[in-house]
């Protein structure tokens, strides 16, 4: 047995203390479920009967979790060096006397920083910030696009600002190398989320690299594939879905009769609390997609706190029923980074890779700035 050194003892004690602290910010049913230990079962995917997927809006990994211990955040030893000779965190800024701007804390305890303005996440601006992988143009890109709000690109929150999000990350599983699908805005990323496609060849209504739907899309979606396979599914949304149900632009859903299974599963709206009721009473389908309301989406300038309330309500309902908790996987991710800085260079396809470029040669397949994702319950 390895010797229990003082350092290892302190590390273990610190981890235990952090877990205890984090649990205080989780809803009551989740705390109870965690205290009960892992559910009995085979420990394999055979135990999973329900998958619940929630895609929130517009936050980058560093913006939320740059200060989280144990992940590739601000202490990342592999952070790249810019052509200036400085770390990627020293973003060039010609308007700053120092010549650079470092990530800075958005203190929500003494300011209104829960409600920061949204910065541009248009395809062209995102690619300008990325600068062909040099990762050195965040300030010029956002000062040009956002004016006086441009520096918000470098702002971040810490544990005191977003305690619930930190509690999830420390109690479950967080992936620090997850990237969204397109270096651009909501629509292309949510289309990949629901269909793995934005029609790069332009044969079925695409290619989609902006938040527009000039024609109805005709390619096949994941929900339709589930229907063909005999797998039950449901989109849970309210009347206010913030335009985040990207089944709506598809011809198959637009033309579906109101009483049809396709419309009822993909387009109908529910009163607040319907998912919570179905989860607590073990009435969930095999796959559920949750769609946030506008103010609970976490899209700036909506608040992380309102998003925390939305997420907490969902996982608390799952944990209310031990049988449901034991057989449910909950996946939380974010569609894109808004215009918020992240230091990790996204993976990109080689030039000429099939289905990664639209007809004009504009690249569409590059992953966006790194997003936090996957809190698995």
PLM features: what roles do these ranges have?
Residues 2-372:
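N-terminal pro-sequences and low-complexity stem/linker regions of secreted or lumenal proteins
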Residues 373-377:
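Hydrophobic alpha-helical segments, chiefly the membrane-spanning helices
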């Amino acid at each position: 047995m390895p010797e229990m050194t003082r350092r290892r003892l302190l590390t273990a004690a610190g981890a235990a203390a952090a877990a205890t602290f984090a649990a205080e910010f989780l809803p009551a049913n989740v705390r109870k479920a965690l205290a009960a230990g892992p559910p009995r079962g085979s420990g394999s995917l055979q135990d999973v009967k329900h998958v619940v997927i929630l895609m929130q809006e517009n936050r980058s990994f560093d913006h939320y979790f740059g200060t989280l211990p144990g992940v590739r955040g601000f202490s990342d030893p592999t952070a790249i060096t810019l052509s200036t000779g400085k770390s990627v965190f020293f973003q060039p800024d010609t308007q700053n006397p120092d010549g650079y701007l470092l990530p800075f804390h958005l203190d929500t305890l003494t300011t209104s920083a829960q409600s920061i303005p949204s910065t541009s996440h248009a395809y062209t601006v995102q690619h300008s910030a990325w600068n062909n992988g040099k990762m050195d143009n965040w300030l010029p890109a956002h000062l040009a696009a956002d004016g006086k709000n441009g520096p918000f690109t470098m702002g971040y929150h810490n544990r005191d600002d977003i305690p619930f999000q930190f509690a999830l990350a420390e109690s479950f599983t967080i992936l620090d190398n997850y990237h969204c699908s397109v270096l651009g805005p909501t629509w292309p990323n949510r289309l990949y989320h629901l269909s793995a496609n934005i029609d790069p060849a332009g044969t079925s209504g695409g290619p989609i690299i902006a938040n527009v739907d000039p024609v109805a899309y005709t390619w096949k979606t994941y929900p339709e594939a589930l229907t063909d396979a005999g797998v039950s599914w449901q989109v849970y949304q309210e009347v206010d879905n913030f335009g985040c149900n990207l089944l709506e632009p598809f011809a198959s859903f637009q033309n579906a009769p109101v009483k049809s299974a396709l419309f009822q599963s993909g387009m109908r709206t529910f009163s607040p609390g319907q998912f919570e009721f179905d989860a607590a009473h073990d009435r969930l389908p095999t796959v559920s997609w949750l769609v946030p309301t506008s103010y609970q989406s976490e899209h700036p300038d909506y608040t992380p706190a309102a998003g925390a309330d939305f997420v907490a309500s969902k996982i608390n309902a799952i944990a209310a029923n031990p049988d449901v908790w034991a057989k449910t996987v909950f996946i939380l991710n974010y569609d894109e980074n808004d215009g918020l800085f992240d230091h990790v260079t996204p993976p990109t396809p080689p030039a000429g890779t099939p289905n990664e470029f639209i007809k004009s040669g504009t690249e569409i397949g590059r992953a966006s700035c790194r997003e936090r994702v996957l809190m698995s319950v």
